[in-house]
Amino acid sequence: MFSILLSFLLSVGDGYIAAYPTQSRQAVETFESCRAELEKVLPSASDEDIRIVFAIVAPEAGCYNSLGDYFETSAVKKGYPSSGSPDYSIGQFQMKPSFAESLENEGAKNSALKAKYGSRLAYKGSDIKSIRRERVSRLSNTDWQIYYLAVFVDVVKMRTAGWGLNDAESKVRYWATLYNAGLYLSKARVEQRQGVKQFPRGTKEFNYSAGALELYKALKD
C-alpha cells in the first residue's frame, strides 16, 4: 500500500516527494524495516501514532547516506568523548550527541519519564569520557535511535500540551520542527521556523516539517 501511494504522489505532486523520489522511497522502506521496533518501544501506540512518530524523522531517514555517516561518526568517536565536539548528527535518524544528552536529562528530572525510561537511559559510571563514548555507541545503533525517538515524543507531548495540536498533521508539523530545529523552541519560534526552507542539508528548497508531513501522508494506509 505504501509503495502504491508513494508512486501516485510521485506522479502528481510538485512537493518534497516529487523533488526527492529516491529519498522518499528510502524513507518508506526505512519505516517498514523499523516498524516492529517502533511498536516494541511504543506498545500502547496506535498505527496512526506509529506513523506520526516515524514521520518526525522520515526526511532524515530518507536522506541517510551510510558513507557520509561513516565519516561523521568516525569524527565524533574520535573527538567527542574527550572534548564534547564535534557534535555532528549521526546514525539512521541523524541525532546529535547533545540531542541525546538533552533527552537523557529530561528522563532523569521528570518523574514520569524517569519511571518509564530512566533505567535504560542511565549510565553505569560517572566518568564523562566513558559516558560520552557510550552515548556515541548508542547513536550508532538504529534500535537505540528508535528508543531516543520514543523519549523525544513523550518529552514533546508534555512541552506542547497547551499548544492546541489536536490533529495528526499539526503534531507532525510541530514535533518535526522541534526535532529538526531545537527541542526547547517556543511555539512562536516553531511557527517561525516552519517558514524557513533549508532542507535537505545545504539547500533552500523545502521546510523540514513540510517534508515530514508529505511523508506522513505517504505512510497512511
Language model regions located:
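Classical Sec-dependent N-terminal signal peptides that target proteins to the secretory pathway
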Residues: 1-7
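Catalytic glycan-binding domains that act on GlcNAc-containing polysaccharides
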Residues: 9, 14-221
